[in-house]
């Protein structure tokens, strides 16, 4: 009877530990940064976003390129990522840039600029622009940005 009691306590303790461990692992942390990827392409996905860090109240441009599943098995790279600001007097002007010349990648590449305070200066709109490259069955390159911009109500 004493052995059964120990076994039950051990089993109960293991179940409590497993449940507690699962709840800790599965509970998402409250992320302070957010953004939405804007993508195009079928065999090679090219994407940009404005990444907003709510805690620091900053923007950065991010870009990624991915060889899509079932595609032509392309090598990919992204570089010359730019965060651009628009004002009525200057048009689109690059305010942050990341060259990110880390070479070709088998599946995907991700790059981003340093941050900027979107509230410094006059009201603005921002966009992300990047240069995308792919090689394989058919090679190509393009500098692309989505037809959208992000602004911050400061």
Region annotations inferred by a language model:
Residues 1-33:
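Secretory targeting and sorting signals
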Residues 32-154:
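Post-signal peptide N-terminal regions of Sec-secreted extracellular proteins
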């Amino acid at each position: 009877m004493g052995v059964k009691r120990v076994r039950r306590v051990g089993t109960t303790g293991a179940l409590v530990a497993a449940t507690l461990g699962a709840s800790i692992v599965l509970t998402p942390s409250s992320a302070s940064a957010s953004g939405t990827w804007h993508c195009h392409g079928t065999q090679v996905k090219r994407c940009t976003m404005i990444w907003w860090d709510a805690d620091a109240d900053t923007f950065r441009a991010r870009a990624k390129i991915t060889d899509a599943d079932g595609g032509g098995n392309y090598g990919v790279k992204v570089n010359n990522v730019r965060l651009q600001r628009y004002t009525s007097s200057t048009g689109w002007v690059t305010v942050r840039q990341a060259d990110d010349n880390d070479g070709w990648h088998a599946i995907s590449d991700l790059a981003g600029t340093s941050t900027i305070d979107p509230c410094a200066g006059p009201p603005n709109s921002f966009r992300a622009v990047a240069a995308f490259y792919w090689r394989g069955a058919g090679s190509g390159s393009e500098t692309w940005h989505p037809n959208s911009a992000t602004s911050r109500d400061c």
